[in-house]
Amino acid sequence: MSKLKVFCFGFGQVAESFANKLIREKKNFDLNITSRQETHQIDFNSIKINSYQFTNIKFDSSILAKLQEADCILISIPPIEGKDIVANFFDANKKIIINCKWITYLSATSVYGDHKGNWVNENSLTKPTSANGLSRLEAEKTWKNLSNKNNYPLQIFRLAGIYSNEFNILK
């Protein structure tokens, strides 16, 4: 079986959990990620990961080749100053996806705004009230436009607040 080639823009809790799931399921995979630091290799739960520098100012050009090889791409970097730097990167480098089976953009439930305690789902009206919600909704629209224009296999997940032992409202 060939290796699954995974590329993660950002490597926060959700991306780490995804990688840990692949490890637990004994999947044969290569993982490349981005960080704000200079490009380097790290050990993550007994596997080697290449971490490529990616910021709103500069990026390691090796990312382009890795994206062309990627089977799946996970985007967990939030908008910076109201702009999605990953979407801007994709727009500027239009021919980067060749073998990609899916691109997942991690958004947030803040795009729904205040529904006064009523249930919301993916068909609910989006009416964000926070700067975060507004920038996430704008990023979703940008990704949908890129997907339509370039036939990207896009899926958007709207996540609620993520809490753990390290990150929670009580600490």
Question: What would you call each of these model-derived segments?
Answer:
Residues 6-11:
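Conserved N-terminal Rossmann-fold NAD(P)-binding element of oxidoreductases
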Residues 15-16:
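N-terminal Rossmann-fold NAD(P) dinucleotide-binding loop
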Residues 32-38, 55-57:
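N-terminal Rossmann-fold cofactor-binding loop
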Residues 34, 103-109, 157-159:
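SDR active-site strand-loop-helix element
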Residues 46, 50-69:
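Conserved Rossmann-fold cofactor-binding substructure of NAD(P)-dependent oxidoreductases
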Residues 66-105:
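NAD(P)-cofactor binding segment of oxidoreductase domains
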Residues 91-131:
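Conserved Rossmann-fold NAD(P)-dependent oxidoreductase catalytic core, especially the SDR/UDP-sugar
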Residues 141-165:
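Conserved beta-loop-beta element that borders a ligand/cofactor-binding pocket
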